[in-house]
Protein backbone atom coordinates (compact mmCIF):
# COMPACT_ATOMS: atom_id res chain seq x y z
CA UNK A 1 0.00 0.00 0.00
CA UNK A 2 1.33 3.43 -0.96
CA UNK A 3 1.82 5.80 1.98
CA UNK A 4 1.13 9.46 1.28
CA UNK A 5 1.99 12.16 3.79
CA UNK A 6 -0.41 15.10 3.41
CA UNK A 7 0.76 18.50 4.62
CA UNK A 8 -2.41 20.29 3.61
CA UNK A 9 -4.69 22.56 5.62
CA UNK A 10 -8.42 22.09 5.42
CA UNK A 11 -9.41 25.61 6.39
CA UNK A 12 -10.70 26.69 2.98
CA UNK A 13 -12.71 25.25 0.10
CA UNK A 14 -9.69 24.83 -2.17
CA UNK A 15 -7.89 22.66 0.36
CA UNK A 16 -10.97 20.60 1.22
CA UNK A 17 -11.69 20.01 -2.47
CA UNK A 18 -8.06 19.09 -3.03
CA UNK A 19 -8.24 16.49 -0.26
CA UNK A 20 -11.52 15.12 -1.66
CA UNK A 21 -9.93 14.84 -5.10
CA UNK A 22 -6.88 13.03 -3.73
CA UNK A 23 -9.11 10.56 -1.87
CA UNK A 24 -11.28 10.01 -4.96
CA UNK A 25 -8.19 9.39 -7.10
CA UNK A 26 -6.87 6.96 -4.51
CA UNK A 27 -10.12 4.98 -4.55
CA UNK A 28 -9.82 4.60 -8.32
CA UNK A 29 -6.07 3.92 -8.41
CA UNK A 30 -5.14 2.84 -4.88
CA UNK A 31 -5.09 1.59 -2.32
CA UNK A 32 -3.24 4.44 -0.67
CA UNK A 33 -2.75 5.10 3.02
CA UNK A 34 -2.85 8.76 4.08
CA UNK A 35 -1.55 10.61 7.08
CA UNK A 36 -2.42 14.30 7.32
CA UNK A 37 -0.48 16.56 9.61
CA UNK A 38 -2.27 19.65 10.91
CA UNK A 39 -1.13 23.15 10.00
CA UNK A 40 0.68 23.66 13.30
CA UNK A 41 3.31 21.08 12.26
CA UNK A 42 5.56 23.97 11.25
CA UNK A 43 5.64 25.35 14.78
CA UNK A 44 6.64 22.16 16.59
CA UNK A 45 10.16 21.67 17.83
CA UNK A 46 12.59 21.49 14.90
CA UNK A 47 9.77 22.38 12.45
CA UNK A 48 10.30 20.83 9.03
CA UNK A 49 13.20 18.69 10.28
CA UNK A 50 10.78 16.89 12.64
CA UNK A 51 8.38 16.29 9.76
CA UNK A 52 11.21 14.90 7.68
CA UNK A 53 12.20 12.47 10.43
CA UNK A 54 8.58 11.44 10.89
CA UNK A 55 8.20 10.82 7.14
CA UNK A 56 11.30 8.61 7.20
CA UNK A 57 10.10 6.62 10.21
CA UNK A 58 6.62 6.15 8.69
CA UNK A 59 8.28 5.19 5.38
CA UNK A 60 6.25 7.69 3.35
CA UNK A 61 6.24 6.96 -0.39
CA UNK A 62 5.32 10.54 -1.34
CA UNK A 63 4.43 13.94 0.08
CA UNK A 64 1.69 16.25 -1.08
CA UNK A 65 1.41 19.62 0.58
CA UNK A 66 2.71 22.97 1.66
CA UNK A 67 6.35 23.40 2.59
CA UNK A 68 8.48 26.30 3.78
CA UNK A 69 10.62 27.68 0.94
CA UNK A 70 13.58 28.05 3.29
CA UNK A 71 13.57 24.31 4.08
CA UNK A 72 13.13 23.07 0.50
CA UNK A 73 16.50 21.29 0.44
CA UNK A 74 15.44 19.06 3.34
CA UNK A 75 12.96 17.27 1.07
CA UNK A 76 15.80 15.99 -1.12
CA UNK A 77 16.91 13.76 1.76
CA UNK A 78 13.73 11.69 1.43
CA UNK A 79 14.31 10.77 -2.23
CA UNK A 80 10.55 10.33 -2.82
CA UNK A 81 8.06 12.14 -5.08
CA UNK A 82 6.96 15.51 -3.74
CA UNK A 83 4.05 17.62 -4.99
CA UNK A 84 4.01 21.12 -3.54
CA UNK A 85 1.10 23.45 -2.96
CA UNK A 86 3.01 26.65 -2.40
CA UNK A 87 1.39 30.07 -2.61
CA UNK A 88 4.60 32.10 -2.63
CA UNK A 89 6.83 30.54 -5.29
CA UNK A 90 6.59 27.73 -7.75
CA UNK A 91 9.23 25.10 -7.23
CA UNK A 92 11.68 24.35 -10.01
CA UNK A 93 12.70 21.12 -8.28
CA UNK A 94 9.36 19.48 -7.45
CA UNK A 95 5.94 19.15 -9.03
CA UNK A 96 3.58 22.01 -8.23
CA UNK A 97 -0.11 22.09 -7.37
CA UNK A 98 -1.03 25.37 -8.95
CA UNK A 99 -3.57 27.06 -11.13
CA UNK A 100 -3.73 28.84 -14.44
CA UNK A 101 -3.78 32.25 -12.81
CA UNK A 102 -3.37 34.20 -16.05
CA UNK A 103 -6.16 32.17 -17.66
CA UNK A 104 -8.39 32.77 -14.64
CA UNK A 105 -7.72 36.50 -14.84
CA UNK A 106 -8.51 36.50 -18.55
CA UNK A 107 -11.75 34.60 -17.90
CA UNK A 108 -12.77 37.15 -15.25
CA UNK A 109 -11.90 40.09 -17.53
CA UNK A 110 -13.98 38.60 -20.37
CA UNK A 111 -16.88 38.01 -17.98
CA UNK A 112 -16.98 41.68 -17.02
CA UNK A 113 -16.24 42.97 -20.53
CA UNK A 114 -19.17 40.95 -21.93
CA UNK A 115 -21.38 42.74 -19.41
CA UNK A 116 -20.06 46.07 -20.68
CA UNK A 117 -17.90 46.85 -17.67
CA UNK A 118 -14.98 48.93 -18.90
CA UNK A 119 -13.16 49.74 -15.67
CA UNK A 120 -12.25 46.90 -13.35
CA UNK A 121 -9.18 45.87 -11.42
CA UNK A 122 -7.55 43.02 -9.55
CA UNK A 123 -6.31 43.32 -5.99
CA UNK A 124 -3.73 40.76 -4.93
CA UNK A 125 -1.08 40.15 -2.33
CA UNK A 126 2.40 40.81 -3.70
CA UNK A 127 4.01 37.88 -1.87
CA UNK A 128 1.84 35.13 -3.39
CA UNK A 129 2.29 33.45 -6.76
CA UNK A 130 -1.19 34.07 -8.17
CA UNK A 131 -0.63 37.84 -8.07
CA UNK A 132 2.32 37.81 -10.45
Segments predicted by a language model, with ranges:
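Short glycine-/small-residue-rich Rossmann-like dinucleotide-binding loops
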Residues: 68
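Redox-cofactor binding/interface segments in oxidoreductases and associated redox assembly factors
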Residues: 65
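Bacterial carbohydrate/catabolite-sensing allosteric modules
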Residues: 1-62, 71-132
Amino acid sequence: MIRILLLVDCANDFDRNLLRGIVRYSRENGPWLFYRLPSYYRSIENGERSILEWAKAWKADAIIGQWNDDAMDLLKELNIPVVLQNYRHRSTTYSNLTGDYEGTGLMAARFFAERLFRNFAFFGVKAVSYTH
